[in-house]
């Protein structure tokens, strides 16, 4: 389940973390998916994926994987990426498959461990596990069937 944040926080994210985030749009310009991330200050070679979401009717087509591949490719071309981290709840099998598949395409191992137990969250939130993926291979196996086209600071994806 995706934690929904305020529109203000997403606007700040777009302004301050555009280099480590991506929005996929369909032919009409409607947002189809997004991934938000940041570089860990104490580990400058590590991209943390904070959120990733794909519109329900577009799931299962490789869009999430294509966005992750695009982000890592963008950062690797700048020489600033060796690893990826994210947090996933134990019940979120779709995200677990997404990140394991990403690791396989990038020739990387996956390690995970408990990070935030449910008791630390003020609402009914599941515990979160930290997934560490890396080191990332130089030339990943591409995600089939998804193509990007440049649209200013976002990316477009055919639905």
Please state what every model-predicted region is:
Residues 54, 60-74, 97-101:
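Conserved acetyl-CoA-binding loop-helix of GNAT-fold acetyltransferases
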Residues 106-159:
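C-terminal "cap" of GNAT-fold acetyltransferases
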Residues 1-27, 31, 36:
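Active-site rim helix/loop that mediates acceptor-substrate recognition in acyltransferases
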Residues 65, 90-112, 122:
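Conserved active-site alpha-helix within GNAT-family acetyltransferase domains
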Residues 40-49, 59, 78-82:
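A conserved beta-turn-beta hairpin within the catalytic core of GNAT-like acetyltransferases
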Residues 75-90:
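Conserved GNAT acetyl-CoA-binding A-motif
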Residues 51-59, 88-89:
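A short, internal acetyl-CoA/4′-phosphopantetheine-binding micro-motif in the GNAT/acyltransferase core
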């Amino acid at each position: 389940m995706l934690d929904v944040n305020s529109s203000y926080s997403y606007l700040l994210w777009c302004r301050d973390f555009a280099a480590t985030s991506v929005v996929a749009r369909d032919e009409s310009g409607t947002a189809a998916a997004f991934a938000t991330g940041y570089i860990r200050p104490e580990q400058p070679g590590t991209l943390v994926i904070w959120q990733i979401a794909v519109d329900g009717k577009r799931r299962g087509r490789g869009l999430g994987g294509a966005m992750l591949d695009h982000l890592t490719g963008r950062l690797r071309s700048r020489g600033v990426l060796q690893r990826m981290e994210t947090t996933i709840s134990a019940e979120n099998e779709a995200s677990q498959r997404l990140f394991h598949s990403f690791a396989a395409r990038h020739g990387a191992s996956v390690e995970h461990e408990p990070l935030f137990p449910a008791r630390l969250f003020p609402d009914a939130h599941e515990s979160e596990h930290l997934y560490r993926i890396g080191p990332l291979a130089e030339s990943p196996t591409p995600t089939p069937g998804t193509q990007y086209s440049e649209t200013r600071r976002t990316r477009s994806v055919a639905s």
